[in-house]
From Swiss-Prot:
Encoding gene (name): cgi121
The organism's taxonomic lineage, starting at the top: Eukaryota, Fungi, Dikarya, Ascomycota, Pezizomycotina
Protein name as catalogued: EKC/KEOPS complex subunit cgi121
GO cellular component annotations of the record: chromosome, telomeric region; cytosol; EKC/KEOPS complex; nucleus
Cellular compartments annotated: Nucleus; Chromosome, Telomere
Record's keyword terms, sorted: Activator, Chromosome, Nucleus, Telomere, Transcription, Transcription regulation, tRNA processing
GO biological process, one term: tRNA threonylcarbamoyladenosine modification
Amino acid sequence: MSASLETIQLPHLPSNLPVHIGLYRDVNNAPFLRQQLLSGNADFEYAFIDASMVFSRAHVLSAIFRAVNDSLNGRLKSRNVHSEIVFSLSPANNIAESFRKFGITDLTKDLLVVKVSVTPDITHNSVAEHLQQSIEGLSVPFTDTSLSEIGDVAKIKKAYKLGSLSTAQDDDKRRLELSLIGAIALRGAT
């Protein structure tokens, strides 16, 4: 089993929609996983996110909340809640661009995997078992420490057009995190 798979109940969302999150390093089969997504294999309906584009837990949890909330309110702009999570990470309204920047590629080595329990048969154990069988990589804890080792701050700042924002001090890192969360919340607002 994936010892590091974390199941989270997001506040302000129904209790029957827990979210399962796994973080993997040194993934060797990204092309296979990406192909499963592209072919529409329902067994691989996950949000496969390039972890180098994730700054913190709060950053990705904000995108998950937005996607699940949009799903519950009939406002999905993509195929399903899992693709919407990847789309929600993007500050732009272009779905294809969001997948290029934030989604899994054939070269992805560090992978964040998210699964929302949209049906009762999706449980912590079923997700952990499937990921253990499917992902060739090292499962690591989904922590801010792990994400800070993986995240490419320069790429993240470029994607969000925040190049001038410093990240030298803890206050600067907090300001960047709040800017990322704000971009997620405001994308598409008119």
